Amino acid sequence: MKKVFITGGAGYIGATLVPLLLKNGYEVTVYDNLSYGGDGIIHNFSEPTFNFIKGDILDKQHLHSSMKGHDVVVHLAAIVGYTACRMNEAHSYRVNHQGTINVVEGLDGDQLLLYGSTGSNYGTVDGICTEETPLNPLSIYGKSKTLGEEEVMKYQNSVAFRFATAFGPSPRLRLDLLVNDLSYSAHIQKYIAVYESHFMRTFIHVRDI
């Protein structure tokens, strides 16, 4: 049975991914500091192949000891989004950059690393982005995640996924994401307010990530 270690596994994407992995026969360990609580993963505790470790990716020693023995490391732990990163810029860089360095340094060389990066790394682009499109992040979020991605790609057995803006229901629901916000407003307030009309975004359902 393959063993999967997920940093930030109690978050929006992680809480969606965990039950899918369990259903498909993986043993899953979530490593999370529960900064947004643990309600999104609590239903998994009844599964015999689910494990939880409360920890922070900035705690290098605890992180490294927890990573041992796993086949795949999925690194999702981060300060996510423009607004959250602006609230504490220094901490955002520590988590998104130094925290990622800590993850990479804890790998044993045989483990596969899957990194949850972001389309915010591209910045303003004319046309369709590809893997070869130069990165020009504009926000603190994009800059800190780009630094993290650079560290990840130094590791030979790694893949980085530059996610589009996610939407859809999750056990750890986020209403600050654009499509979720508009859906909530339409249902509860009976109207939506469209803002930043000059911006263009790509979207992906959280279950398609």
Model-derived segments and their meaning:
Residues S144:
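Active-site helix of classical SDR
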Residues G127, L138, E150-R201, V206-D208:
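NAD(P)-dependent short-chain dehydrogenase/reductase
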